[in-house]
C-alpha cells in the first residue's frame, strides 16, 4: 500500500486514514469532518457522544489518543493517523465495572449523556496519578465538560471512589424513603445505553432538511417532483403530511418547522 507521512503519522493515499482503535487497526474514509464522526458513523462506536460538534465545548465526545484525553470532534483524521485511540469500549472490564459501580453508587449521573466523556477524562487522570489524585485537581479538569444535571459534586465523589479503589454498595431494591440506584446507571456511565442518535436499526432511513433560501417569503408552491427522482430518496415529506402542530419553540411556539403552501418563512 502506498503511504505518505503527515505530521509524523502514517496515512494511506486513496481517501483512507489508518490508525488503531481499542488496539485494533482500522481504516476509515478521509471524508469525515473529524474523528468523532468516523468513530460513530463508520465504526459504529457510540460511547463517545455528540453534544456540540464541532465546537469542542461540552466534552461528551472525549476519547484517549495515545493515552491523553482529547475531545474527538476537534481532531482531524490527519492528526489521528498512525496513532492509538481508546474509547470506553476498549477499557478493561475491571475498570469499566469500577467506574460503573462508582457512578451508580454515588448518584453521579442523571440523564447520563455527558458521563462517558467524563469517565474517559477521569481514567486519564487516574492512570497518571492513581490514589494521589486530588479532588480539586480533578475538578479543574472537569472544566472541559458540561453537565446540566448534577452540579459535579457527586461526579467528583464517584471519581474519588475509583481513584481510591473503593467499592461502594449499589442499592437496587427498596421502597418509599429508600435511597436507590438510578435505573440503568451502569449502562449510562459507560455509554452503553443508546440515545436516539446511537440507534442503528436495520433498513434505517436518514432525513435531510431543506430550507428556503429566502428569510422572509410567502410559500406559493412546493414541487417535490425532482427530489423524488434523486437516487436513494424514498419519499419527501412536507407540511401537508403532518397532521399535528407545525410550530415549536423554547418559550413561545414561534419557530416554523415545516411551512405549508400559503405560509411565510421567518428565518433570521
PLM feature segments, named:
Residues 1-174:
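Signature of N-terminal electron-transfer/Fe-S-associated modules in redox systems
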